[in-house]
């Protein structure tokens, strides 16, 4: 192994690629944005031939302005780099079209693929098509539709912090009425549990508060559901590790993402601390 590590950051314009690269730069990566795909091999050779410290890390940003043929050939390039002993990973960022259009409206920036009076929706559609080869080979995808800049930086920082010590697990709570996290590897439904929302004295609290915890723990169904989720995840974690996975996202949802899912996510994250190299916790609807 060469000791080099390369992260390719790509995704839809407006989904947070610049934030991702800045976060990696702060974490000690040497970052290059808008690098042509054809030069990735040259960058790898440069890094291998110079007197670089062991474990040096690079990150490159790629977008849809690369020639379509180059984007289609990227998977072959990445395979060649891995065969050379370079630890290579692809991070793909995306968001719903309505969110991207709103972000462009707020920043008044022009989409890189927009030509003349072409509608933004057409440019976004073309970009999704061009970048599909990257999304298909991504090791890690993040839907930033409901993710703040702070949240995105935190997710990437957590990933980088745990990249050298085995499997990292993100446990996330969410509300079904706000949409299922599309980047989750496992999704569990806690709506079968009694809802604290319908208890007037508990409605204003969350699953992080003792009063809600006490209510849920008094329900026999809660312990049964938690035990089944915890057992399933613990059973499959070693399998994911043996398969070479470095990151796993477990999502637990309830109706609004305030009580039941928050409680279960808190407990699951605490339970998984034993046996996992790195466990992080995020409450999407409480962010």
From Swiss-Prot:
GTP binds at residues 63-66. SUPFAM superfamilies: P-loop containing nucleoside triphosphate hydrolases. Pfam families: PapZ_C, RapZ-like_N. ATP binds at residues 11-18. One of its GO terms (molecular function) is GTP binding. It comes from the Bacteria. InterPro entries: P-loop_NTPase, RapZ-like, RapZ-like_N, RapZ_C. Keywords: ATP-binding, GTP-binding, Nucleotide-binding. PANTHER family: RNASE ADAPTER PROTEIN RAPZ (PTHR30448:SF0). Displays ATPase and GTPase activities. HAMAP family: RapZ_like. Belongs to the RapZ-like family. This is Nucleotide-binding protein Hhal_2130.
